[in-house]
Amino acid sequence: PAVQGNDKKYTMSSVLKVSAADWKTNRFYQCQAGYNLNDMVESRFETPKIQEPNITALVPSVDFISSQNAVLGCVISGFAPDNIRVSWKKDQVDQTGVVLSSKRRTDNTFETISYLIIPTVNWKIGDKYTCEVSHPPSNFRSMISMKYQEGEKSSCPSGSPPGTCPPCSLTPELLYHTNLSVTLRNGEKH
């Protein structure tokens, strides 16, 4: 039933209960409301698409492991809806990393970066670090392990300038940069 507010205007609400099977089957729902049949307002509700994330590991290049701290990163992109969980481990022991707020991309998926700041000495002695990512809506769960290996050089795809691996919006002095406005350099957040 309609309820009159203090401003003498009436408001009304309606709830449509839908089974999970119908929710997954139908792409959108429409609602019409109004006082006159000729003057109805319509709203359209789209069911959210479910998309698994892509995960890319970011490790410090040789140029960036001379400072006291190193930054390991995990770029998580292309997921929907915005419901992501990230955890870090060092040789199976929980570590405290940072997960930045997700940003919506033009294709209506999301992306974020998680990073872990570690002492460079721990990286150089070969401790294994793992970024674990889960996305409950898609039942996705995966992990990427990172470990320093002396003398190993990263390989770039043919035609990519140095310092641009993996292929993304990079300049040679940045470890990683996206529209998330995050730049990691010399083991610090800038």
Curated annotation (Swiss-Prot):
Any Pfam family: C1-set
Cysteine disulfide links: C74-C131
Keywords: Adaptive immunity, Disulfide bond, Glycoprotein, Immunity, Immunoglobulin, Immunoglobulin domain, Secreted
PROSITE patterns linked: IG_LIKE, IG_MHC
Compartment(s) of residence: Secreted
Biological process terms in GO annotation: adaptive immune response
Glycosylation sites recorded in the entry for this protein: N54, N179
GO cellular component: extracellular region; immunoglobulin complex
Main location class: secreted
UniProt cross-references to CDD domains, sorted A to Z: IgC1
InterPro entries registered for this protein in UniProt: Ig-like_dom (IPR007110), Ig-like_dom_sf (IPR036179), Ig-like_fold (IPR013783), Ig/MHC_CS (IPR003006), Ig_C1-set (IPR003597), Immune_Resp_Modulators (IPR050380)
Tissue specificity: Expressed in pancreas, spleen, epigonal organ and at low levels in several other tissues.
Domain Ig-like C1-type, residue spans: 53-145
Protein name from the UniProt record: Pancreatic IgW, short secretory form
